[in-house]
Amino acid sequence: MIKILALATLLISGFLPGVTVAQQAEYLGFRACTKCHDSQGETWRASAHAKAFDSLKPNAKSEAKTKAKLDPKKDYTQDKNCVGCHVTGYGEPGGFVSGASLDDMKTLVGVTCESCHGAGGKFRNLHGEASDRLKNQGETSERKQLVTAGQNFDMEKACARCHLNFEGSTKHDAKAPFTPFSPSVGSKYQFDFQKSVMTTGAGNPIHTHFKLRGVFKGDPVPAVRAKLQEDAPEPE
């Protein structure tokens, strides 16, 4: 069923003006990533991002919703003003589809790998080829090809899309629908990218950053990478 929904989305977008082939690259779901990045996947499953969709359910996060003037008893899982920041690829080819069976959408539920790194259909094969090249020939690959293909390296912008998208935001070009969870609701919503990304252990909102193997070389290198790699553990 999920393949049928994805195909329908692609067919529709193919007739929309201004939509290029590159923009039609599909979201693949987190399992396409964790087949290789299993250690990252395991720690992500315990994170707040993995459970983001659950917070839209009735009676979940009631205190926070009340402070933000939302109805804690309401089911927001189908609310188009909320869903986009709690699932992956909402409204995009291959992404989460409201109204579809959650069983079909299960690898797109929550803020997954592709929410930050971009639709895997654009660059997954390049990762596989580069890994094989390093393993078989001992050669590293240029990271620039990933940028050309569409992988996102501007992590801070990816975070700001939801965490700083409140009305009146001065740190992000906020656009409707705005998040109701602004700093005026509570200090915890004063999003700090550096602090959030550097958090380790049980409170990590994303996943543990493990030692990277040097499959790719060259720019761009996210500014936080060097710091994260200083004490990054080995993949399990």
UniProtKB/Swiss-Prot annotation:
Q: Where does this protein reside within or beyond the cell? A: Periplasm
Instruction: Identify which cofactors the protein needs according to its UniProt entry.
Output: heme
Signal sequence span per UniProt? Answer: 1-22
Q: Which UniProt keywords apply?
A: Electron transport, Heme, Iron, Metal-binding, Periplasm, Signal, Transport
- What does the entry list as the binding residues for heme 2? C82, C85, H86
Q: Does the keyword Metal-binding apply?
A: yes
Q: Which InterPro entries match?
A: Cyt_c-552/4, Multihaem_cyt_sf, Multiheme_Cytochr_ET
Report a single Gene Ontology molecular function. metal ion binding
Q: Which Pfam families match?
A: Cytochrome_C554
Q: GO terms for CC?
A: periplasmic space
Predominant localisation class: periplasm
Subunit architecture: Heterotrimer of alpha, beta and gamma subunits.
By what name is this protein known? Perchlorate reductase subunit gamma
**Origin organism of this chain?**
Dechloromonas aromatica (strain RCB)
